């Protein structure tokens, strides 16, 4: 019997969580699918799924957080349809004369390789009152704990937006963290037809976005309970797709935050694996020479040794800019 899209999506969790084949089998059974454990194992093999952390101790990794937020649009008065310049005096106001601004509807997050998808969404009353302080405080706890935060367009949208709402709600900033913006990675490293997350995840055959339309956002702003539940589910799907996309893109990220420094061990700077092979090539700076390695964990070819292996001391450098 042909495997459905939902079944395949469940099986893919084997690749980027700590779930075993038996866990996938039980999840399929709980979802109403009649598959044997043997069939699940064959499916995993046929999809060529493997553990991206097979050569590392994930308990030693820094805290790496996948993050996605959903915000409301800004209600405005407009004289016509189409592209136009909307100024702040065109923003709608409530009965007390207060500007009706955008706010955060929900967030979803996932620690790298962890099975659990975390999320929070406004209640019906909070959505109507435009009160996002509670969900911001729950998100703040994760941001404060994270060493690295990964998001698609996160540097421009998610992280700046959430900090804007922190400021508006009198919430102090979390502890510093590094960021990986997968949109920037896509734009820098590839010439894809589209850099949208939905396009890239479809291209890579990983978790796709749920289908939605603008009315969902309107219903959420009006406090529709079912719409808010759907928004949270949409948000959670995005985070699952984000993690799978990041793992596929990771070997191409030449400027990945150095995990080896955070772990203080001789491991892959991109994924933390200690399974490194020398490739017999070198990376050269203005005055130094470093051995290059290939990582068997994340397949990254960008790993260089820490020690200068040059046999000569070079004191002359170019003064050109």
Show the residue positions of the predicted features.
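Short, charged amphipathic recognition helices of the HTH superfamily
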Residues: 16-29
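Short, cysteine/histidine-rich loop/knuckle motifs that typically chelate Zn2+
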Residues: 269-270, 297
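Short metal-binding segments enriched for Cys and/or His
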Residues: 292-317
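Short, amphipathic alpha-helical "recognition" segments used to contact nucleic acids or chromatin
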Residues: 3-19
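Short recognition patches in nucleic-acid-associated and regulatory proteins
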Residues: 272-293
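Metal-dependent phosphoesterase core characteristic of DEDDh/y 3'-5' exonuclease domains
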Residues: 35, 43-53, 62, 102-120, ...
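Conserved RNase H-like, two-metal-ion catalytic cores of nucleic-acid enzymes
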Residues: 55-143
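Residues immediately within or flanking Cys/His clusters that coordinate Zn2+
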Residues: 263-268, 292
């Amino acid at each position: 019997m042909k495997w459905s899209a939902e079944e395949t999506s469940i099986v893919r969790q084997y690749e980027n969580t700590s779930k075993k084949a038996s866990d996938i089998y039980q999840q399929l059974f709980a979802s109403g699918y009649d598959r044997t454990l043997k069939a699940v194992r064959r499916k995993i093999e046929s999809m060529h799924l493997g553990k991206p952390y097979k050569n590392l101790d994930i308990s030693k990794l820094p805290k790496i957080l996948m993050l996605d937020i959903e915000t409301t649009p800004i209600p405005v008065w407009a004289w016509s349809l189409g592209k136009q310049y909307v100024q702040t005096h065109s923003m709608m106001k409530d009965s007390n004369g207060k500007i009706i601004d955008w706010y955060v509807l929900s967030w979803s997050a996932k620690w790298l390789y962890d099975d659990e998808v975390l999320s929070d969404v406004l209640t019906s009353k909070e959505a109507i009152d435009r009160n996002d302080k509670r969900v911001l405080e729950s998100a703040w706890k994760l941001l404060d704990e994270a060493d690295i935060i990964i998001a698609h367009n996160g540097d421009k949208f998610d992280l700046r937006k959430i900090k804007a709402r922190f400021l508006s709600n009198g919430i102090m900033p979390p502890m510093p963290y590094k960021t990986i913006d997968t949109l920037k990675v896509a734009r820098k490293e590839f010439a894809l037809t589209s850099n949208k997350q939905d396009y890239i995840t479809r291209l890579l055959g990983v978790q796709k976005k749920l289908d939605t339309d603008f009315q969902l956002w309107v219903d959420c702003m009006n406090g529709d309970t079912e719409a808010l539940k759907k928004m949270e589910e949409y948000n959670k799907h995005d985070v699952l797709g984000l993690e799978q996309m990041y793992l596929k893109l990771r070997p191409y990220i030449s400027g990945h935050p150095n995990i080896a420094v955070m772990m203080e061990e001789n491991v892959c700077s991109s994924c933390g694996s200690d399974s490194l092979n020398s490739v017999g090539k070198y990376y050269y700076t203005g005055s130094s020479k470093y051995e290059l390695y290939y990582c068997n964990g994340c397949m990254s070819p960008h790993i260089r040794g820490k020690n200068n292996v040059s046999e000569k001391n070079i004191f002359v450098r170019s003064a050109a800019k």
